[in-house]
């Protein structure tokens, strides 16, 4: 992918000019030799230099050049023309450099031919005066004769712009009409350099963040308000502002919608191309390219062109009367240019900014020039995609009507995002704009009873009002300048924006909504309030201030480098201090009455706080003739979960754990869905999990190897004695002794195995965990009091008893943000893990617990779960496949760095004076042993660091007992717009149907790769084929070469599941909790799924030593009717983050 020229070599990417290298003699010299005099020396080059040649027209008196390109179809209207002259070089000039008028460029003609196309590029200082153009924008004419006579009109236009693509395919009716000759520019362009969220450049966001707003009112900059902490080697080197600000004498909409601006990319994300450097504020403004095109073509357009100097018939004051008058003044022009009203809105907003007092917490929110500019950007981009955009209504300057207009746009165009990554981003921008229309003032937010901010946090925020106001202004401006950085928060995508709007942002005051800035201020501010002195030293290298710690957390949260769990996102900073995600309850109840008491008290209290629960019911084992079964108690639990979720905006759930020798195991396997025999036994709102001893799989393997009459024995409470309390060899000796004594009911082992896989394939559960592996690798010996269960999502390993419940607080790091220029940045990963460990320790210290048992579990072990999200996204950004040797090595490397960084940070807290967790002295850490040392195949690459940590750990201790837990990140991965957890993408086009309609979430990286590979009719055919094959590239394009880039875009169903199990096993030495590993299987062509498929996968997971053998089982139907993964009415939002 071509990138913007490096600051140190601005001519590096130029194509030859006039037969010379761009770094050679000036274009002025070449132009004179060709008889084409220029007022200034200008080099011209294309950002994508693949075969592009800029040639002198060699016409006496001409001020034009021709582009010769053998791959002009790929370049097309998105060819980023960059001028290297006195003002605009390969990068912005130093602020003190002398200014001169910037040239403009307009592509005026395209020639088609098998040997390449040509385009006339007209140069000028400022255009000649046209109707409606102010006297300040006059220029000398470009002689039509110099261009060899009037050229034919452009092949097609996009919203007033012109396109240079030769493609002659018919456009899909959904994008603009049956008779249009070509499709949307998105399908023609090469997104690699023009799209602001290109996969290779978005990793510069965190570096660009600190430079993004150098011209906020009052001289405030983002650097002043929030220093960037990134020190990556790939930081952009820029000498001036990233984007030219809209100064008081500069119209924000100089370029008509759909028309390329100076040096702009007609398919790019803004009127000013993000990759093309732009002149400093105050420099001569580039002319309207549409006027230049008229000059070059000799056309006479009677339509008035509205510029900075347009004289409106009413004052620059937004009132209903003035807005209606301007609408009448513009007349039919607003139908041709839907965003035309926005120029008036922008100029009025600019005038209002001059009148209003400086911003404070009490300042009422208002729509600013930046907000209208954001809307203009979105409308221009949609026009470039050939969408029929409705005009901006005259009353859209009012928040309510702007919200209605945005909703109309989003609902109307969201079905089309499956074909356009850019549209997916643009609709996300619009949703963020809709969120802004519901903002309240900071003062109203601080006082809100519904938000209920922590009192200490409120005081701190008031103490730092001036800094926070500057930061808010800087970020507002920064997010509106989305074309100044590859991938800002507002441009993460439609699903990300909707997730904020619908779930994470708090409602208050009837119709107000917490802003994204306020949400992250609440979280980061609270973390800064509760950070200890030791934490400040670790984070900042010195004690530091509250404001410095606030910046430390805010930057990493706002940039999605670290992501708190869902309870933390919703509750941190409020007086509702419940931030724990996972609870493990083992009431050890042996009777129906005791089990019901545990459910209605202990479990109900946790559900009331929206916690996800793993409940061990192994001890209640009285099923038999004339005795009670556990099923009536589970029916009560099922109803309790359903009742809690009915009124909850954040549904949760419970999972019951029992071992496979429990007499009720067969009933539990039949309690969900179509397998439930009678209604009294149906429990559709809870999950089940089997706590499998090694002995079961040893016998199952014997059966699979051909041994006959292999049996398994079920025991009740009276005969099972203490089987649940032992593991490993002790369990096997006791179990076999009971069999010899003749106790229990013997069944063929294949009968139970078949029941397990039948239930899993039909309902998605039971989940499967390996009891011996969990206990074998725990931090202390559990023989005689074996760990008996896990949490709702099977990734937490924690002891629980009648007196103490297991509790875990979660956070995750976004691995996709660690990819920098197709390189994985382990320094950034270490920084993110460190910040996440500090955040979770503050959560452990601050959180309330719903029961005394939970309080004991939280305080004694201080267990944390640091997870990951975006592993597959990072893999794709790096250009790798999960099957490649490079990725498999990276997979182990990432896991090791995460555990090492987490343990080093936890140890550093103890070095700084914090107490080790209460059970440290009985743990293996006291003896200097690590989790990975129990895995014979583990080969750590940081042996020196591990040895230093060992010595420090034995001397000072660890603040936490456990560290890494790889949970599903279903919710938070949506706001980050990355793949969930460590799993491959479930599908390349995710569809979610709600009462508001269907929302699609495409794999934008795949869409961009498709646009690089195909064009025209072939691209549309490929997308149709993907639709028919559930967006599986392997099925839709089976003829691709094995090394083709598109081969990387496999879904979870396309991968060999044994490979995914092996990847989990490779990470296992460095995952001291466990991993929520889902299995993805596909039916055979006849619609059947052999039981042996799942059985052999479970056996493989057992042999590889995993703790979790199967979280969900998801089955892809052979009939193209979708994917079944159990009951979709229950969604775990606790440890699913």
UniProtKB/Swiss-Prot annotation:
Cystine pairs: 582-808
Catalytic activity: a 2'-deoxyribonucleoside 5'-diphosphate + [thioredoxin]-disulfide + H2O = a ribonucleoside 5'-diphosphate + [thioredoxin]-dithiol
Positions that bind substrate: 566, 581-582, 612, 791-795, 968-972
Record-marked site positions (Important for hydrogen atom transfer): 582, 808
Positions occupied by motif RIP homotypic interaction motif (RHIM): 64-84
Annotated positions for site Important for electron transfer: 1111-1112
Region ranges (Disordered): 1-32, 124-159, 173-315
Acidic residues bias: start-end ranges: 196-206
Name used for this protein in its record: Ribonucleoside-diphosphate reductase large subunit
Organism: Human herpesvirus 1 (strain 17)
């Amino acid at each position: 992918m071509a990138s913007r020229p490096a600051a140190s070599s601005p001519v590096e990417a130029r194509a030859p000019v006039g037969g010379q290298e761009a770094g050679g003699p000036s274009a002025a010299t070449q132009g004179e030799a060709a008889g084409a005099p220029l007022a200034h020396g200008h080099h011209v080059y294309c950002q994508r230099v693949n075969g592009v040649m800029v040639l002198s027209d060699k016409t006496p008196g001409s001020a034009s050049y021709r582009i010769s390109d053998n791959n002009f179809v790929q370049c097309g209207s998105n060819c980023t023309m960059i001028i290297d002259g006195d003002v605009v070089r390969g990068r912005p000039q130093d602020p003190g450099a002398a200014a001169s008028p910037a040239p403009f460029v307009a592509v005026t003609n395209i020639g088609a031919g098998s040997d390449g196309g040509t385009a006339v590029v007209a140069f000028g200082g400022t255009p000649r005066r046209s109707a409606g153009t102010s006297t300040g924008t006059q220029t000398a004419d470009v002689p039509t004769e110099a261009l060899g006579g009037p050229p034919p009109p452009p092949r097609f236009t996009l919203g007033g712009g012109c396109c240079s693509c030769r493609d002659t395919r018919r456009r899909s009716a959904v994008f603009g009409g049956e008779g249009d000759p070509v499709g949307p520019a998105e399908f023609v362009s090469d997104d690699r350099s023009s799209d602001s969220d290109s996969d290779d450049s978005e990793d510069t966001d965190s570096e660009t963040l600190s430079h993004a707003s150098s011209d906020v009112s009052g001289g405030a900059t983002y650097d002043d308000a929030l220093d960037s902490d990134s020190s990556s080697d790939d930081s952009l080197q820029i000498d001036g502002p990233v984007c030219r600000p809209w100064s008081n004498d500069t119209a924000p909409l100089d370029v008509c919608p759909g028309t390329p601006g100076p040096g702009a990319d007609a398919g790019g994300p803004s009127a000013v191309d993000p990759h093309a450097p732009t002149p400093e504020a105050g420099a001569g403004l580039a002319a309207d390219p549409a006027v230049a095109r008229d000059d070059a073509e000799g056309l006479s357009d009677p339509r008035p062109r509205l510029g900075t100097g347009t004289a409106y018939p009413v004052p620059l004051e937004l009132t209903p009367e003035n807005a209606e008058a301007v609408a009448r003044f513009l007349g039919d022009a607003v139908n041709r240019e839907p965003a035309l009203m926005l120029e008036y809105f922008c100029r009025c907003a600019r005038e209002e900014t001059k009148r209003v007092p400086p911003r404070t917490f009490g300042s009422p929110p208002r729509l600013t020039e930046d907000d209208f500019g954001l809307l203009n950007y979105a409308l221009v981009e949609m026009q470039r995609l050939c969408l029929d955009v409705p005009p901006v209504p005259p009353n859209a300057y009012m928040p309510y009507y702007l919200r209605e207009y945005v909703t109309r746009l989003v609902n109307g165009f969201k079905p089309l995002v499956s074909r356009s990554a850019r549209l997916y981003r643009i609709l996300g921008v619009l949703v963020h704009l809709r969120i802004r229309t519901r903002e309240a003032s900071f003062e109203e937010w601080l006082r809100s009873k519904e938000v209920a901010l922590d009192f200490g946090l409120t005081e701190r925020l008031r103490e730092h009002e001036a800094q926070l106001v500057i930061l808010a202004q800087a970020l507002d401006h920064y997010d509106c300048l989305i074309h100044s950085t590859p991938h800002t928060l507002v441009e993460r995508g439609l699903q990300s924006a909707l997730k904020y709007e619908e779930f994470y942002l708090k409602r208050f005051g009837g119709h107000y909504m917490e802003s994204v800035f306020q949400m992250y201020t609440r979280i980061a501010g609270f973390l800064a309030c509760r950070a200890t002195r030791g934490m400040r030293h670790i984070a900042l290298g010195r004690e530091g201030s509250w404001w410095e710690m606030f910046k430390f957390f805010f930057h990493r949260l706002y940039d999605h480098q670290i992501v708190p769990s869902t309870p933390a996102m919703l509750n941190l900073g409020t007086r509702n201090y419940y931030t724990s995600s996972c609870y493990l309850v083992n009431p050890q109840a042996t009777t129906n009455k005791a089990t019901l008491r545990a459910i209605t008290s202990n479990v109900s209290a946790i559900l009331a706080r929206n916690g996800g629960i793993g409940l061990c019911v192994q001890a209640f084992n009285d099923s038999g003739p004339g005795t009670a079964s556990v099923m009536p108690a589970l029916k009560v639990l099922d109803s309790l979960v359903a009742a809690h979720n009915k009124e909850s905006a954040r549904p949760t759930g419970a999972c019951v754990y029992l071992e496979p020798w429990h007499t009720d195991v067969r009933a539990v396997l039949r309690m969900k869905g179509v397998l439930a025999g009678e209604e009294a036994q149906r429990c559709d709102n809870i999950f089940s999990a089997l706590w499998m001893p090694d002995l079961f799989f040893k016998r199952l393997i014997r059966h699979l190897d051909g041994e006959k009459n292999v049996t398994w024995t079920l025991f009740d409470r009276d005969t099972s004695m203490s089987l649940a309390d032992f593991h490993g060899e002790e369990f096997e000796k006791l179990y076999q002794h009971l069999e010899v004594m003749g106790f229990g009911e013997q069944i063929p082992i294949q009968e139970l195995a078949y029941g397990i896989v039948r239930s899993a394939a039909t309902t998605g559960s039971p989940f499967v965990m390996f009891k011996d592996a969990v206990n074998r690798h725990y931090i202390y010996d559990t023989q005689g009091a074996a760990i008996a269960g896990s949490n709702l999502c099977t990734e937490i390993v924690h002891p629980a008893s009648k007196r103490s419940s297991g509790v875990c607080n979660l956070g995750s790091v976004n691995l996709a943000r660690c990819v920098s220029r197709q390189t994985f940045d382990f320094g950034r990963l270490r920084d993110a893990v460190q910040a996440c460990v500090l955040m979770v320790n503050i959560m452990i210290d601050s959180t309330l617990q719903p029961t005394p048992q939970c309080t004991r579990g939280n305080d004694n072990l201080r267990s944390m779960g640091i997870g990951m999200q975006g592993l597959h996204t990072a893999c794709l950004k790096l250009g790798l496949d999960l099957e490649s040797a490079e990725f498999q090595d990276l997979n182990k490397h990432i896991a090791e760095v995460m555990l090492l960084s987490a343990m080093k940070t936890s140890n550093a807290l103890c070095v700084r004076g914090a107490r080790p967790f209460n059970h440290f002295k009985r743990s293996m850490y006291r003896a200097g042993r690590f989790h990975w040392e129990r895995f014979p195949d583990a080969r750590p690459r940081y042996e020196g660091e591990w040895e230093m940590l060992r010595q420090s750990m034995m001397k000072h201790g660890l603040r936490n007992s456990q560290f890494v837990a790889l949970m599903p990140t279903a919710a938070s991965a949506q706001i980050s717009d990355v793949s969930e957890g460590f799993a491959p993408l479930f599908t390349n086009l995710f569809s979610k149907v709600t009462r508001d309609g269907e929302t699609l979430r495409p794999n934008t990286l795949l869409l961009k790769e498709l646009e690089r590979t195909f064009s025209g009719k072939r691209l549309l055919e490929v997308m149709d084929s993907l639709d028919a094959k559930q967006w599986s590239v392997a099925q839709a394009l089976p003829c691709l070469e094995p090394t083709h880039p598109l081969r990387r875009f496999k879904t979870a169903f396309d991968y060999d599941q044994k490979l995914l199990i092996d990847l989990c096993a490779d990470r296992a030495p460095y995952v001291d909790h466990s991993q929520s590993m889902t299995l993805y299987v596909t039916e055979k062509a006849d619609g059947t799924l052999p039981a042996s498929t799942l059985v052999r996968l479970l056996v493989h997971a057992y042999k590889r030593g995993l703790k979790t053998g199967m979280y969900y089982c998801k089955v892809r139907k052979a009939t193209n009717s979708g994917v079944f993964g159990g009951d979709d009415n229950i969604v775990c939002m606790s440890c699913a983050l």
